[in-house]
Amino acid sequence: AGSLGTSASLSAASCEIGSFQGELGTVILDGAPGEPGSPFRATGYFLPFGSDGFSAGRRRTGALAEFDATQMEVGDPAGLDRLAATVRASARRSVEGLEPRAGALSLGLVIGDTSGFDVGTEGSFRRAGLSHLVAVSGSNVAIVLGAVLILGSRLSVPLRLSLAGAALGIFVLVVGPEPSVLRAAAMGVVALLALLLGRRSEPLQALCLATMVLSALRPTLVFSLGFWLSVAATLGIILWASAASRSLERIIGSGRKRAWLGAAFGVTCAAQFAVAPILALVFGTLSVTGPLANLLAVPAVPLATILGFLAAVTGTIAAPLADVCAFLSAPFLGWILWVADHLGRSDWSDAAVSPHAGWALMVLVTVAGVTTLCVRRT
């Protein structure tokens, strides 16, 4: 399910002219009639796509038509889909004891579910440039893979990588195949294969390979704003994060804490710079407080996310333990919300940008990227 509706695969259909069986294609339904992977039987009408932008977006998903259901019976998911549904249900139950906004943020960080966000909070996150925190992507994949590899450090390399690959697959099932998730997962697979073969994985090559493979397998991703932002942010981090970090370290000096601050600053500025043209052209606004908000909020994200993951997983076998993990995550969630509230609710938090300025930014970022690549090759 997404903002365009729920994509459903048809395996059987009956109408006045006859009955059909097999892989019949996909249709788009309004809302989310059940957990992902749930089978359903419905009566309704197939509707052709309209000519408006919303219908065009639905068409680009590869669906054949819209489906307006008048009656629907939804079953329970089976197999791995059932496991994923259990983990999602556990995550939702574990945050019931938290303050509502903190619980909604936890679900956004862990499984990408932002349905609990109120309009004010959602707007604050957008204006403060923090919306990417609740769009599950590379950082979440890194946390999952890192945790599995560390916990399995005593195992053989092939077994550790196999467990990490399995955990990555389950993670994608739980959060859903969103564009940013697919990009991050594909890069994770490339990195795991490189480790298995004993080779070093170059981030830029991994990003290019992941982007090409995903675009070939799911051509509709090229129309996805989430995919554009995910690829652009990752490319920006690869190209400019180190240079930005070193620049700040020259100003504030060296040291472990200062190096950590420099790394956080570098990642934040590099990603913000890379996605700025896309945000300007699509939304017509840019966050003024984004770099500062990210610098303040991002340090709390790993702990809030890890504790949220632990709550979701342990909740499937021991609810009290999940409650403890959720309770421990509350201060970190509260800090992120505080940053969003104070840096995202003012009129000056974002600025309107004209299309001409957006294209100028696109040229600037492109030239900077090409220049960086040329300098690295010399």
Q: Residues of each region from the PLM?
A:
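Helical transmembrane-bundle signal
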Residues: L168, Q272, T305-G308, L337
